[in-house]
Amino acid sequence: MIVVKSIEQYDINSIYFCDPIKNKIVDDGKFIKILYSASNFILNGIYLLLNFNEINIERYYNKYKCNFNINNNEKLIESIKNIENNLLSKYELTGKIPNYKIYEQLKNGNIKLFCDNLKKTNNNSFILKISGLWETDIYYGLTYKFIKVN
């Protein structure tokens, strides 16, 4: 079972960071798991329910890509940008450069989807799963993926 929060329900004060471990994906990097702790549960990561306006999903090589109109999703993009900024600021890595990968992807009007088989629906809902932070000698950012809700 996954507990999904709306952006309005999300609370930065419920975020905790685990100790850094060796990153298995980025060479010479670290991974810091994020925990979301509410009064009656703790989640490994953050799960946010997002509803985009005017989407078009297409096959992109062996994956899927969702295109959307930036102007019609401006408020949602701004909210996600603020969440990303606040999470990276909360971890307080001085001397390193934050990488805003979620916002960079959104401002281009598309997201890459992680799914093997996508069913056609009229549903414009997605889950943004933020599992942690990655860190290198110079940069740091969030580890995330977008999942289509069927």
Please name every model-derived segment.
Residues P20, N53-I55, N71, D116-L118, ...:
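Generic structural motif
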Residues L49-N51, F114, K145-I147:
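Residues in well-ordered beta-strands of folded domains
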Residues Q105, L118-N122, E135-Y140:
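Intrinsically disordered, low-complexity regulatory regions enriched in Ser/Pro/Gly/Thr
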Residues I130-N150:
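OB-fold single-stranded nucleic acid-binding module
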Residues D27, L43, E104-L106, Y139:
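A generic structural signal for short, non-catalytic loop/turn and secondary-structure boundary residues
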Residues Y91, G95-N117:
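Beta-rich interaction modules in large eukaryotic scaffold/regulatory proteins
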Residues L113-I127:
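Short nucleic-acid-contacting surface segments enriched for D/E, G, S/T with interspersed K/R
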Residues M1-G95:
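OB-fold ssDNA-binding interfaces and closely related basic DNA-contact patches used
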